[in-house]
């Protein structure tokens, strides 16, 4: 009996110890679960805080983009060209002939807060504008963009006030060191090239054209908007014109003259070139006073029939271009029969795949008294080769000091026929 009781107590004690161990194990499990829950709650809290911070920053960014912020400013810098063309036929009238030059002129530097400018900059693409002209083809890609912008806006520029938009196409240039100076050079080249390639744009004064660089700064990020206008001037017309109607009326007069001459066009380029040459020297008087302002363009040459060498050369190109005969204007220096050197302008024209020089100005000398000019003088510089022209004509590779360097067509060595 005692032996059975002893076995019972041993069994009971084992059961009791087992339950104690089980209870202790359960307590440890609950503690671990609580710890896991605390860690999970902490992680969730951190994640929520990060989400709130990111969301807040995003909302702040959107708000600044829409409504702007105090850290944005807009700065406009203007660059102006000067155009002071003078040419001469004799040393007594001699003045230096120049073409557009850039002068950095911060006449209107403006800084505004971002609330005045919120719209996005527009990109203007002039790639579709097709140009194939002699001096244009020598420009770099950036100058060609500005040239094409002029060509695209040619009709609008007859108003004298149209703004030529270039958008942000020069941002990569302006972000580089000295970028504004580079853009000035591109602009310089484009303006002078456009005026020499297109004598029909006689009503535009380069000295009244302003290149504007608008810089917008947002939190260290700069964007650039470039455009061309008349600055603070009422228009960019030459002094002869003040209204669009005056310009269009003059264009109409010029087109009538050109139409009459073109109606006499033959199938022989030689006779067509000779016809234009003869028309100019028969109808234009060389202006020895240099008092008129339009003596340097086709308006003075063909409408008022009085000009200097630059007017002769531009008028010749204007008429020959209509006949689709390749022609360029040339500037340089020439030495007259008295041995005096002067600034001068003339033309090169292509016939039968060769280039020849024509100097209408010196084929139309000023006659004192009732004397007459014989053919030996009248055609002295008509379709001449380099062997003749090099004796008294020297070309200039630059239209302006420090401007683009150009190459002229290579003249045939001998005269035509």
Segments (PLM) and residue ranges:
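Hydrophobic/aromatic-rich core segments of domains that either
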Residues: 311-388
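N-terminal accessory/pre-domain segments preceding catalytic cores
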Residues: 36-267, 389-417
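Hydrophobic (often cysteine-bearing) scaffold residues that line and stabilize catalytic clefts
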Residues: 183, 272, 308, 312, ...
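Short, positively charged and aromatic/hydrophobic N-terminal segments
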Residues: 6, 10-14, 19, 26
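Secondary-structure boundary elements
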Residues: 242-301
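Juxtamembrane low-complexity tails/linkers enriched in Ser/Thr-Pro and polybasic
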Residues: 24-36
């Amino acid at each position: 009996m005692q032996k059975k009781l002893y076995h019972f107590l041993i069994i009971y004690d084992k059961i009791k110890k087992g339950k104690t161990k089980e209870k202790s194990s359960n307590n440890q499990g609950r503690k671990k679960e609580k710890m896991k829950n605390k860690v999970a709650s902490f992680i969730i809290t951190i994640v929520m805080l990060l989400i709130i911070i990111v969301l807040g920053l995003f909302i702040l960014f959107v708000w600044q983009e829409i409504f702007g912020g105090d850290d944005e400013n807009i700065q406009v810098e203007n660059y102006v060209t000067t155009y002071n063309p003078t040419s001469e036929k004799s040393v007594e009238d001699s003045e230096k002939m120049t073409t557009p030059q850039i002068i950095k002129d911060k006449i209107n530097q403006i800084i505004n807060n971002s609330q005045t400018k919120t719209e996005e900059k527009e990109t203007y693409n002039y790639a579709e504008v097709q140009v194939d002209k002699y001096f244009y083809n020598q420009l770099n890609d950036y100058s060609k963009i500005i040239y094409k912008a002029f060509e695209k806006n040619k009709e609008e520029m007859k108003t004298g006030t149209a703004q030529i938009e270039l958008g942000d196409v020069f941002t990569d240039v302006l972000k580089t060191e000295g970028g504004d100076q580079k853009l000035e050079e591109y602009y310089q080249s484009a303006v002078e090239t456009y005026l020499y390639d297109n004598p029909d744009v006689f009503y535009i004064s380069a000295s009244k054209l302003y290149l504007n660089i608008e810089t917008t700064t947002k939190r260290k990020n700069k964007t650039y908007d470039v455009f061309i206008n008349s600055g603070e001037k009422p228009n960019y017309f030459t002094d002869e014109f003040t209204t669009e109607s005056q310009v269009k009326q003059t264009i109409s007069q010029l087109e009538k003259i050109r139409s009459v001459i073109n109606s006499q066009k033959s199938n022989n380029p030689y006779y067509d070139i000779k016809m234009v040459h003869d028309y100019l020297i028969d109808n234009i008087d060389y202006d020895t006073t240099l008092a008129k302002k339009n003596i340097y363009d086709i308006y003075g040459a063909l409408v008022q029939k009085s000009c200097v060498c630059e007017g002769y050369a531009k008028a010749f190109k204007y008429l020959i271009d209509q006949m689709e005969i390749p022609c360029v204007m040339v500037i340089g220096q020439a030495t007259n029969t008295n041995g005096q050197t002067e600034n001068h302008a003339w033309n090169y024209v292509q016939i039968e795949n060769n280039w020849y020089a024509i100097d209408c100005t010196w084929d139309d000398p000023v006659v004192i008294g009732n004397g007459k000019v014989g053919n030996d003088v009248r055609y002295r510089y008509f379709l001449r080769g380099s062997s003749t022209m090099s004796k008294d004509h020297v070309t200039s590779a630059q239209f302006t000091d420090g401007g683009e360097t150009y190459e002229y067509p290579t003249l045939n060595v001998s005269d035509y026929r």
